[in-house]
Regions:
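N-terminal secretory/membrane targeting signals
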Residues: 1-21
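Membrane-embedded alpha-helical segments and adjacent helix-loop junctions characteristic
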Residues: 87-179, 341-409
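Hydrophobic transmembrane alpha-helices of multi-pass solute/ion transporters
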Residues: 43-114, 127-135, 286, 290-356, ...
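Structural signature of hydrophobic alpha-helical transmembrane segments
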Residues: 31-45, 100-111, 154-163, 223-234, ...
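Membrane-core helix-loop-helix motifs of multi-pass transport proteins
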Residues: 2, 9, 176-265, 272-280, ...
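Re-entrant/interfacial helical elements at transmembrane boundaries that shape
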Residues: 161-172, 185-186, 199-213, 295, ...
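C-terminal transmembrane helix pair
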Residues: 221-229, 349, 382-478
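Hydrophobic core segments of alpha-helical transmembrane domains in multi-pass membrane transport
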Residues: 9-14, 42-55, 70-80, 109-117, ...
Length: 478
């Protein structure tokens, strides 16, 4: 077996053949490969994978594909080298550790997305859009309503889903007002990122910190006021640039499908179980979410078994004239597995690739070197602010997972600061967060990368104000 591995290694890892077998490293100690061909190849494939993922719209290649392939190449290279040095088990255990962290994230997000798909399928989000239109709010009122709804909903719902929902509302009410669409979408992106930052149930980077048991669930709420400031400062300034007139009302009626309100209740119960299980039973968050998925599965069974065919007595006439059965008269089945299948698998697989790549770089030794540079030679506050600014163009979940793998020795106040800056820093650029990227793809006119850039100074002002607020009200955490 070693001979076969040696041949394979010689094909794409030439220096592995000449690695000394008597390296003096214990059987359980990771090898320092930062100055080895394996380390250099890890950096190369990391850069290639991320460049390809960031160029998704240009090269028309889904972002998950290069990330998953890059992570596979890097880990196979590492494992082959370790096997040649008689330490295959060390590399395998490191891989399994990173895989476990991903599986917990996967199950958590999978359940959350499944509930969101179920709500959308039952007409809840469409009903919200119609309700807002029928209330005849002015553009300025809608600017604040969509912003606050985005802020609140993002504490418990995926930021991408909330961003797309509120973006759809802004587009629907501002058909002939591209100026309103653009400024409302900027406000929505800022609100979503701010709202998801102080809740592990809504933000990926915050969820990572919670999963690693660095901070307790309740401690994140210390960021509620700083996050609110981050949202309000740019929103107040943008308010004066929003049109004052009122859009036309919608002629559509709200049609919620059977079971919609009960699904909302089940989602709330799921979140309560998740938090309670983590706080009092010390279970991982994924355990509570999977319990909630089981509830939704049984409710799906109940809806399917108790559904009544509501076709009217004139059904034969509809069929004869080739007319569709009116909404509300058709049989309303509910298939839970369709909702599971419709989750954002590209996003979930992207996170697999990102987390495994970051885990590999940590195992090779690069993240320790970066941690020494960031936190050893700089004050933690400066390091955390810089990392937060970098989230304007790098996914905040990936950055947080990288910092967690650096294992910096930080007080709770600095961990809260890092959570804050990474969460809200993505608002600075349209490509810095999932809601921004999602709206760029959804909105055809009014909201562009350049338009978002125009408001970056006021968003940066909110970023600075939120940091100052954190130091002011959370001094006891430092």
């Amino acid at each position: 077996m070693n001979g076969i591995l040696l041949i394979i290694a010689s094909l794409f890892l030439p220096s592995a053949v000449f690695a000394g077998e008597n390296s003096g490293v214990g059987a359980t100690s990771p090898l320092d490969l930062t100055h080895h061909i394996v380390g250099y190849l890890s950096i190369l494939f990391t850069v290639l994978a991320y460049v390809a993922a960031m160029s998704e719209e240009v090269i028309e290649l889904r972002k998950s594909k290069p990330m998953v392939l890059g992570s596979a190449i890097i880990w196979f290279a590492i494992c082959i080298y370790y096997a040649l040095n008689g330490q295959a088990k060390v590399a395998a255990l490191a891989f399994e550790s990173n895989l476990l962290a991903y599986i917990e994230l996967l199950l958590f997000i999978l359940v959350s997305m499944t509930y969101l798909n179920a709500m959308e399928e039952r007409g809840i989000f469409d009903g919200l859009r119609i309700w807002l239109l029928n209330k005849q709010f002015s553009y300025r009122q809608l600017f604040w309503i969509t912003g606050f709804l985005a802020f609140v909903l993002s504490t418990v719902v995926s930021g991408l889903a909330v961003g797309l929902l509120m973006g759809a509302v802004a587009t629907a009410v501002g058909k002939n007002k591209t100026k309103f669409i653009g400024i409302a979408c900027v406000n929505i992106v800022v609100a979503v990122n701010a709202g998801g930052t102080f809740s592990p149930l809504g933000g990926i980077s915050t969820l990572f910190v919670w999963q690693h048991k660095i901070l307790k669930f309740g401690e994140f709420f210390a960021l509620a006021l700083p996050c609110l400031v981050n949202f309000l400062v740019p929103a107040i300034i943008m308010h004066f640039f929003v049109p004052k007139d009122t859009p036309a009302a919608s002629s559509r009626a709200i049609n919620l499908r059977r079971g919609s309100k009960r699904i909302l209740l089940l989602f709330a119960v799921t979140l309560v179980i998740t938090v309670w299980g983590n706080v009092y039973l010390e279970l991982p968050p994924a355990a509570g979410m999977m319990a909630g998925l089981a509830l939704l599965q049984f409710f799906s069974f109940y809806l399917t078994q108790t559904v009544k065919n509501q076709e009217s007595q004139f059904a034969y006439a509809y069929k004869f004239f080739g007319v569709d059965v009116p909404v509300g008269n058709e049989k309303q089945d509910f298939d839970i597995y369709k909702n599971v299948g419709n989750v954002e698998w590209d996003t979930l697989l992207f996170f697999y690739g990102a987390m495994m790549i970051i885990g590999a770089l940590s195992f090779v030794g690069y993240l320790d070197a970066i941690a020494q540079f960031l936190y050893g030679q700089n004050h933690p506050t400066n390091a955390n602010i810089i990392i937060g600014l970098s989230s304007a163009f790098i996914d905040n979940g990936t950055l947080m997972f990288a910092v967690l793998n650096m294992h910096p020795d930080l007080p709770p106040g600095q961990w809260l600061l890092l959570t804050l800056t990474l969460g809200v820093g993505g608002s600075l650029l349209a490509i810095g967060s999932a809601p921004g990227v999602g709206l760029l793809g959804q909105i055809k006119e009014g909201y562009t990368f350049g338009y978002h850039m125009r408001w970056m100074p006021v968003i940066l002002l909110g970023y600075i104000a939120s940091i100052a607020t954190h130091f002011w009200i959370n001094a006891e955490y430092f």
